[in-house]
Amino acid sequence: MILTYKEILDKKLSINSYLWPNEFDPYEFIKTIVKAEIKNIGLHTEFIERFGINKLKQELTLNKINVTSLNSIGYFTDPKYFNENNKILSYAKILKPEYVCVISGGIKGGPNPLSKLYTCNKSVLNISQIRKDSSLKIKELFEKASSLNVNLGLEPIGSWEILKKGHFNSISSCLKFLKNNNHKLIIDLYHSFSDDDLDLFLKNSKKLGLLQFSNINFDKDFRPSGRRNINVIREENDLDITRYLKYIFNRKDNTKVEFEIFPHDLKGNDPKKIIMNLKDNILKLFI
């Protein structure tokens, strides 16, 4: 039986809790996605802790909501964030996400703000040595997660964020870690839209775990500077979202597509309305 795009979207669409502002009641986020008939969710640690992990697990089970991603672990260059990995893996044992997102961390530490535990040689950017050191830590983390039956999704980070967020910046640089294990890549269009390997990887690779998507804002110097909602009316420099979603929709596996924007991307827009209109806005792209 051939499924329609609507039927596929009903199965595959997820939305990440990063969108939900901290000052909003986290329960309202769950209530809104249930009302919008979205069956999958991505979670981040601050949301989990505001909700309470046991209460959140009950709500997800009650409403039959699948967890596509738990965000994030790794951050191998900054001890403060790196030391939280065990806590987040313990959350994964309870919430059972399809993947726990792994982000390598900035050459200068991070994510922002830098912690007081972070130190570096400020006179030189020793990128090759930091990548070498992190490679060992990634392998150790993969082995630990495998022993816990937790699947990880390593995320390539756009090279323009190498100093503050991630120092493995391409699909090819991340794939080398995925041999002989069940871990995969999480592809975020915001970070990988210009990757040479993107199209073929999304179409065919068995190492794709999840596609995170949104539109992109560019600053006056044409650098990525934030995320945008899915527009019905095309604007200048929109990504060809339809193309990338079709790649996932045409796959024979159960790979999900996860909408991800952040509170600072809302620009005064009501997150509830964004959630309620998301399915329709995506489907209108295919008309």
Task: Give the role of each language-model region.
Residues 1-99, 128-129, 146, 181-184, ...:
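N-terminal pre-domain/capping segments
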Residues 52-63, 136-145, 200-201, 243-248:
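Catalytic-core regions built around general acid/base machinery
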Residues 63, 148, 181, 204-207, ...:
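Structured helix-beta-strand junction loops
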